[in-house]
């Protein structure tokens, strides 16, 4: 089933163009120039970078919801308009989706990076990270329960995407230090900065000059490899860090 993330209608031709969701989720991963901030919250080296990239790969997971997909009907989504859904933004829906999976350890084990922490403990320490990532539109998402925005097929497809996306980040690891109270406090302190990084990644990943829209399904690994090469050009447009003047 095809899920869209972005849509634009040509004002002259009247023809709509979509960008498939799976590929938008991946190109948002292309910012690793935040080492100082991430190091302060326990993310270091390649495993930390891949953890953050893995986290970003689900930033718009709420767009799998039928209530979002029915805004632009594509092949395979024709039934969405017939379903009565609650009116929530995709950031709230994404957070709610993750919180639901947190209650299912067997499923959770299949989509989380490795860690010395147990599955239940990993779910606990990841809650703030999921909130920061899904809430990348200026406000932390509030937990909503008993939502009917996702059909059973929506949930199955979103879960399948998360399973496949995890394979792209083999070195990703959830640090044991995440359970420490001091690290949790620092994560909350820097949460707005981290969310800002997610926004910046989203903006860069949405730049069609570097990342062309894709409306036909291709293997995630193929698209990811291509996106990585384009990311080098995309990140080159960012200004360098300012130097501190000596007085």
Language model features by range: what are they?
Residues 246-247:
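Conserved mid-sequence domains
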């Amino acid at each position: 089933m095809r899920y869209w993330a972005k849509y634009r209608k040509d004002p002259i031709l009247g023809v709509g163009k979509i960008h498939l969701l799976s590929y938008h989720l991946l190109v948002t991963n292309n910012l690793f120039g935040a080492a100082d901030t991430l190091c302060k919250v326990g993310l270091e080296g390649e495993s930390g970078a891949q953890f953050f990239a893995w986290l970003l790969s689900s930033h718009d997971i709420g767009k799998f919801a039928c209530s979002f997909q029915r805004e632009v009907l594509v092949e395979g989504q024709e039934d969405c308009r017939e379903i009565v859904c609650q009116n929530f933004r995709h950031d709230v829906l994404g957070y709610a989706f993750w919180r639901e999976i947190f209650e299912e350890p067997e499923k959770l084990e299949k989509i989380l990076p490795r860690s010395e922490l147990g599955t239940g403990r990993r779910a606990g320490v990841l809650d703030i990270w999921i909130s920061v990532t899904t809430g990348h539109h200026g406000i932390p998402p509030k937990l909503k329960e008993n939502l009917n925005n996702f059909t059973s097929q929506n949930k199955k497809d979103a879960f399948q995407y998360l399973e496949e996306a995890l394979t792209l980040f083999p070195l990703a690891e959830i640090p044991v230090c995440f359970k420490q109270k001091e690290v949790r406090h620092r994560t909350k302190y820097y949460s707005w900065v981290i969310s800002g990084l997610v926004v910046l990644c989203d903006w860069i990943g949405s730049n069609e000059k570097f990342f062309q829209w894709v409306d036909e399904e291709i293997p995630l690994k193929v698209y990811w490899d291509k996106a990585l090469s384009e990311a080098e050009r995309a990140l080159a447009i960012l200004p360098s860090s300012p130097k501190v003047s000596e007085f």
